[in-house]
Regions:
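Transmembrane alpha-helices
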Residues: 1-155, 168, 186, 239-372
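Structural signature for solvent-exposed beta-strand/loop edge elements and short helix-capping sites
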Residues: 153-213
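Hydrophobic lipid-interacting interfaces of membrane-associated proteins
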Residues: 214-221
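Beta-sandwich strand segments
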Residues: 222-227
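Active-site catalytic microenvironments in core metabolic enzymes, especially phosphate/sugar-handling
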Residues: 230
Length: 372
């Protein structure tokens, strides 16, 4: 049960986090705006339209910044709260009353859990719903058109899928090109169409792409027996349906899109038979890192207490410096481990969970340094 002092610490933690977030995001916005202000100042725009465009752009970017800087700001807020407790000698009456210093962790961990739940809600609910807006360039109206990143369909014998651009709102691929491999055609054969629309699986047909207005004639005799099962003519001679598990959102900005996907969407991509080994590795790493991020944040809070309230040192500045150095080292370890996982030197699960194991052990080891 929370005491009055617990509520006091929890309120101070939330207040400190809000102040840090507003300050850092405001600094980021000012620097980014002054660096890229020309992108917003288009010809023919009034001052009101420019202000609306700036507000809209940075309003949506707030969710992305919260996802990026949130974990670090949570730990910094806890360190600041502990430092203020020591500076104002607010922890001394608690220790004099025989209450262990680790009792202070209860409100701090509770606040860390609440803030991490907000991070999870932002990652799983808000950012996927703002995916289009978060890809809109500065000064642009909407990121409705994106450049195509060609992919290979591993469920279709490495069929190559390409195009000129994708229209996100219509989920349409413009100037689509589907290069059929030898397993589907007797010779290298490319189906080119004005556009292609992805059709999800239904009771009547599997998932695939409907190619509309083919360029040239479709010769079904060029297809192998397997190709005739996967490439189906629509009957009008201009449209063709190709069975494929490559979804629409796999055709543009795949690397950056991982943070714009919910965890369930990541799991669906990992299970998708059309996804190759390299994308599966990066998607698995992103999924594991989402699971471990709250744990790393809570372990950092647990380590901050004995480092800020060290019994060997009465210098608050020295304690804060040691705490910053130790947690900075573990942050570097985490980033290095994720980088090794991204370059396939470590398995995705090991790359994400190795920092958790190291920090969990270190938090137990540093517990003996706390004041009593």
């Amino acid at each position: 049960m929370f005491t009055t002092f617990d509520k006091y610490l929890l309120t101070r933690l939330i207040h400190t986090f809000v102040v840090f977030f507003v300050a850092t995001y405001g600094l980021y916005m000012v620097i980014d705006l002054f660096t890229n202000v020309d992108d917003f100042l288009r010809e023919g725009r009034s001052h009101g339209e420019v202000a609306t465009s700036i507000g809209r752009y940075y309003g949506f970017r707030m969710a992305e910044f919260f996802e990026m800087a949130g974990p670090t700001l949570i730990v910094l807020s806890c360190i600041a709260v502990l430092g203020l407790l020591e500076k104002h000698s607010e922890s001394h009456p608690i220790l004099a009353a025989g209450i262990p210093a680790f009792r202070l962790l209860r409100p701090l961990l509770a606040g860390g859990i609440v803030l991490n739940l907000l991070l999870i809600a932002n990652q799983e609910l808000l950012m996927p719903s703002l995916a289009v807006e978060l890809q809109t360039p500065r000064g642009g109206e909407s990121a409705s058109v994106q450049k195509v990143e060609p992919v290979y369909d591993y469920s279709n014998y490495l069929m190559h899928i390409d195009g000129a651009e994708v229209i996100i709102e219509e989920r349409r691929l413009v100037n689509a090109s589907f290069n059929l491999p030898r397993e589907l055609a007797v010779k290298s054969y490319a189906l080119v169409a004005e556009s292609a629309v992805y059709m999800p699986a239904s009771e009547k047909r599997p998932a695939g792409w409907l190619l509309q207005n083919l360029t040239g004639l479709f010769d079904r005799q060029l297809l192998t027996e397997e190709g005739q099962k996967r490439v189906r003519s629509a009957g009008n001679g201009k449209d063709v349906f190709i069975v494929s598990d490559v979804s629409f959102d796999q055709l543009y900005n795949r690397g950056r899109n991982l943070k714009l996907l919910s965890s369930w969407q990541l799991i669906e991509r990992i299970r998708n038979p059309s996804t190759g080994f390299v994308p599966v590795q990066s998607q698995s790493l992103a999924l594991h890192s989402r699971i471990t991020r709250p744990l790393l944040s809570l372990f950092s809070i647990a380590m901050a207490l004995p480092l800020v309230m060290r019994r060997e040192s009465r210098s608050l500045i020295m304690n804060m410096a040691v705490c910053a150095a130790v947690l900075g080292g573990f942050y570097a370890l985490t980033q290095a481990s994720l980088a090794l996982g991204g370059t396939h030197f470590l398995r995705p699960d090991l790359a994400a969970w190795l920092p958790v194991m190291v920090m969990g052990s270190a938090s137990v080891w540093t517990a003996g340094y706390v004041q009593t």
